[in-house]
Amino acid sequence: MNKVYDWFEERLEIQAIADDITSKYVPPHVNIFYCLGGITLTCFLIQFATGFAMTFYYKPTVAEAFASVQYIMNEVNFGWLIRSIHKWSASMMVLMMILHVFRVYLTGGFKKPRELTWVTGVVLAVITVSFGVTGYSLPWDQVGYWAVKIVSGIPAAIPVVGDQLVELMRGGESVGQATLTRFYSLHTFVLPWSIAVFMLMHFLMIRKQGISGPL
C-alpha cells in the first residue's frame, strides 16, 4: 500500500495538497453561523445524488410525468425515501442559503476585497431559487401546472420584450409539452452545470482571500 501511495506522491505531491487544505488558518471569531454555506453545499450534493437517482424513472412528458412520479413513490425500492429526501433537502438548501446571505451581509463579508465573492454568491442564490421553480413543475400535477403558468406569465409585465420572454419560457403561446421539456432541461442540465461553475469560483475566492474578519 505504501508503494502505491509513494507512486502517486512522487507524481502528484498529494501530501503537499493535503497539508495546504488542512493547515488553512481559521480566525478565532468564526462560529457555527459560518458553517451555513457549507451546509448549503451539503444540501446541494444530496439534491444531486437523489435527483440523479430519480432520472432513471422519471418521464418528462405531460402524459407520463405524474404517473412516473407515482411509480417512484409506490413501486421503486426506497423511491419514496429518495424523493422525500430530495424534497426536504431542497427546502433546507433554500433556507440555509437565505441564512448564509444574511450572515455574510450582517458581518460585512461583502466588503472590499470580497466584492466578487459576494457577486458570485448572489448568482448562486438566484440559481438556487431557479432550481426550486423548475423542479416544482416536474411532477406535472395541478400544483405544478398552475405554478408554471403563473411563473412563466410574470415576464409579460415587462415592456416591449415581455411577450417574447413568456413565449421563450413556455416554448409557445401556452403551457404544454415544450414548457415541461424546457423546465426539465433547465433543472437537470443547465442549472446544475451553472451552479457547479459558480460554486467553484465562489470557493476559490474564499480559499484565496480567507474568511472575513469581525466587524
Curated annotation (Swiss-Prot):
Binds 2 heme b groups non-covalently with two histidine residues as axial ligands. GO terms for molecular function: electron transporter, transferring electrons within cytochrome b6/f complex of photosystem II activity; metal ion binding; oxidoreductase activity. Heme b 1 binds at H100, H202. SUPFAM superfamilies: Transmembrane di-heme cytochromes. It comes from the Bacteria. PROSITE patterns: CYTB_NTER. One of its GO terms (cellular component) is plasma membrane-derived thylakoid membrane. One of its GO terms (biological process) is photosynthesis. Heme c binds at C35. The chain crosses the membrane at residues 32-52, 90-110, 116-136, 186-206. It is a multi-pass membrane protein. Belongs to the cytochrome b family. PetB subfamily. PANTHER family: CYTOCHROME B. This is Cytochrome b6. It comes from Thermosynechococcus vestitus (strain NIES-2133 / IAM M-273 / BP-1). The lineage of its organism: Bacteria, Bacillati, Cyanobacteriota, Cyanophyceae, Acaryochloridales.
